[in-house]
Amino acid sequence: MIERLRGALASASFPVMALLLLSAIVVYPLWTMLFLGAVFAYIVRPVALRINRRIPYLSVSIILAMIVVIMPLVGILVFTVDSIINSAPSLLSLAGSIHVPGAGNLQPSAENTLANLRTVLRDILSGSLNYVVAILQSVPMISLQLFVFLSSTFYFARDGKRLVGYIRTLIPEETRPFMERMASETERVLLSIFYGHFLTALAIGLMAAVGFHLLGYPYAILLGIMTGLFQLIPVIGPWAAYTPLSIYDFVTGNILRGVLVLIFGLFLSTIDIYLRPKLSGKYADIHPMIFLVGFLGGPVVWGVAGFIVGPLVLGLAYAALEAYRMESGGEEVQ
């Protein structure tokens, strides 16, 4: 037993495994940003290669592609935080001053219900504002994570092909077919998640912002962003944004706008029902429950980044299982 232990310690694999373990400990606090960097590099690289046809410097092309792809997302995030901070006092005041025509004639139970609704709305707005303030208080850590994210996106986009080639040389010959199949399935799953969920949410959010503005709602862009976020959650969808607006209009006596926003919301939901499965199923038919669990469980483990990391991790696990099923000759599930 002791001789076998000595042999294991003296073998070449022991220092390699020990160093890999130490490296994992070093990388662990930042692995979320590294993971996101690898995912965004997958999106940035094709754009950079197109730019590289006109600009002969790949590094410059990647930086320009990152500006094209990532900066709009950063702008939306900054605008959302700024809108919540600036509009929260007005919304809190509005929530406390909601007046229902004929409220004096309502039964006490109905009056209590309205009072409870005001309280819940104020609590939600206050909680959202406190959450944003808490995030802003951790600006140094966020800045570090953002730096790691941008740096990893750049280097993965520039040297990712070499990294994949290096990893391929480490894979034993007998397992390469499985790994190739897994890489193919992973690509299909990533495209399905990106086009079927994130791109659909972006389209729904943009249409919602325009529609809410035309209907005369204040903070239409913020409402559009919220609609896009709700769209990411399969079970919820855009109705979670337009239904409260419709109820508010009905309660405050603006019946016409309440009906119009309800019709507009049904239009958004119809687009969601049609567009999401059409785009997602074009690449990989992922069950909505996988995305839902990842979307809700991810933030619990990884914070705000978990909204993206959670679905991707479960999607990659699904891709690995699908590759294993196909490699072992499993039948197609109907």
From Swiss-Prot:
Assigned protein family: Belongs to the autoinducer-2 exporter (AI-2E) (TC 2.A.86) family.
Keywords noted in UniProt: Cell membrane, Membrane, Transmembrane, Transmembrane helix, Transport
GO cellular component: a single term: plasma membrane
Spans through the membrane: 24-44, 60-80, 84-104, 131-151, 189-209, 220-240, 255-275, 289-309
Topology in the lipid bilayer: Multi-pass membrane protein
Primary location: membrane
Subcellular location: Cell membrane
Taxonomic source organism: Methanothermobacter thermautotrophicus (strain ATCC 29096 / DSM 1053 / JCM 10044 / NBRC 100330 / Delta H)
Protein name according to UniProt: Putative transport protein MTH_1211
Alphabetical list of InterPro entries matching this protein: AI-2E-like (IPR002549)
